[in-house]
């Protein structure tokens, strides 16, 4: 068995990798991600997943429902870490799968794939607690800077973590951003990870303090200009697992069931067949006896 296959087995068992192995894995992942464009072209069939937020046992449930890699092609829309108790295992398993099956799993960046955010919402503290050093946090946050910003499925479905930006009109404009940096506090890269749709006209400031709120008219024009039939994003809790808006021109997919171990929501994944027919698969949280019961404080902010 190769090192990478051994690491996948170790992580699936909920065990931590050695720090030296984490460094090797992260370097391998950076080499692969470095060769990917800002906007990745993905071919259907593919299964799209929203926020995971360190809920490792629920990620295992997701794979039970959706199938294992590489039998199923996956596109994850970011926010792999923070809030949940097992961000380390969650992120490293997804990275290991990416290294082992680079064409079967696509990872794009969420607003929590950020040095600043992870220092507040759990990942930083978890790394320190599990490894008694910040090296693993540093290795992982370096990988964050290499993650793509968006994906397009079959030239028809635009996938992003958060939403749109008033500073761009075309997907091609995303392709020229310098993405290899910490998530900025403003600008296009920030907006892609922080913005939200709402029942408004045009654009509005966001209560999140980053990104914007945008309405149906903005989505209609963006989709028309770019030849897109659907915007698929994550970033907001959907109690029923997914939420369609604006005459089905935008969908929020949420893949962390019983978010923060207390919200009581179901989760979903969106399966697209080769003809882009959509199947929303719902799933609930893993049995509580299998989830980590480690007590820790999770900052109370629901983004």
Curated annotation (Swiss-Prot):
Disulfide bonds: none annotated. It catalyses: O-phospho-L-seryl-[protein] + H2O = L-seryl-[protein] + phosphate; O-phospho-L-threonyl-[protein] + H2O = L-threonyl-[protein] + phosphate. The active site is at residue 112. Its cofactor is Mn(2+). One of its GO terms (molecular function) is protein serine/threonine phosphatase activity. GO terms for biological process: double-strand break repair via homologous recombination. Mn(2+) 2 binds at residues 79, 111, 161, 235. Pfam families: Metallophos. It is an enzyme of class 3 (hydrolase). Its EC number is 3.1.3.16. SMART domains: PP2Ac (SM00156). Mn(2+) 1 binds at residues 51, 53, 79. GO terms for cellular component: cytoplasm; nucleus. Keywords: Hydrolase, Manganese, Metal-binding, Protein phosphatase. InterPro entries: Calcineurin-like_PHP_ApaH, Metallo-depent_PP-like, PPA2-like, Ser/Thr-sp_prot-phosphatase. Binds 2 manganese ions per subunit. Belongs to the PPP phosphatase family. PP-4 (PP-X) subfamily. PANTHER family: SERINE/THREONINE-PROTEIN PHOSPHATASE PP2A-RELATED. This is Serine/threonine-protein phosphatase PP-X homolog 2. The lineage of its organism: Eukaryota, Sar, Alveolata, Ciliophora, Intramacronucleata. The gene is Ppx2.
